[in-house]
Design a protein with these regions (language model features):
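A solvent-exposed interaction/effector surface
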Residues: 1-188
């Protein structure tokens, strides 16, 4: 397995208020398990959902790609959810798949999807640049996990925000990046 060639960049951002159109699963553990579980729910299999999301106009992250990934505006997300499964970080969450939309979005909401308002908030970004999916995906994932695990918040004035409802985005587009965007809050 080839090692990831680039380091993980870490920075803070403020993301403006937006909407998130998505499906949600309280039991899945990762992307493949998410779609396996969703395939058991009528109308929520990967092909159906990705096709519906491709038809949504005004996706904030759409780079014009045709593949159902971050390049076409489709992303995984995790919502802090007290009734969700406990993830490897010890945080109860629900896994989601969907698209970010502007706050003034007033278009279609497919019946099997949820549309929520996400307020403006601060986030920490862990980002790895372009990589070869076949030879580097595993090593990039390891580098990203290590960067998040080892990040020292003590000198930043922030900590992870584990409040119910806060959302954590995951962008996977090997041509551009692997990016985790996690909610933070100021330390009092």
């Amino acid at each position: 397995m080839e090692r990831a060639a680039e380091d993980v960049k870490i920075y803070f951002v403020t993301i403006p208020a937006h909407k998130f159109l998505h499906i949600k699963n309280y039991e899945s553990i990762g992307y493949w398990d998410f779609w396996q579980k969703q395939s058991l729910i009528p109308g929520q299999d990967c092909q159906t959902i990705c096709s519906l999301l491709n038809g949504i106009q005004g996706k904030l992250d759409d780079m014009g790609e045709s593949e159902p990934n971050s390049g076409s505006g489709q992303i995984m997300a995790y919502i802090n959810e007290p009734t969700g499964r406990i993830c490897s970080w010890g945080i109860p969450l629900a896994e989601c798949y969907g698209v970010r939309l502007s706050m003034d979005y007033d278009g279609e909401v497919p019946e099997q999807m949820l549309l929520i308002d996400v307020p403006e908030a601060e986030y920490i970004v862990f980002e790895h640049g372009p990589f070869d999916y076949e030879s580097q995906n595993s090593s990039v994932e390891e580098a990203m996990e290590a960067a998040m695990k080892n990040f020292d918040f003590s000198k930043t004035g922030y900590c992870l925000d584990l409040s119910p409802g806060r959302i954590f985005y995951f962008y996977h587009d090997p041509k551009r990046f692997w990016k985790y965007i996690r909610p933070v809050k100021k330390v009092m």
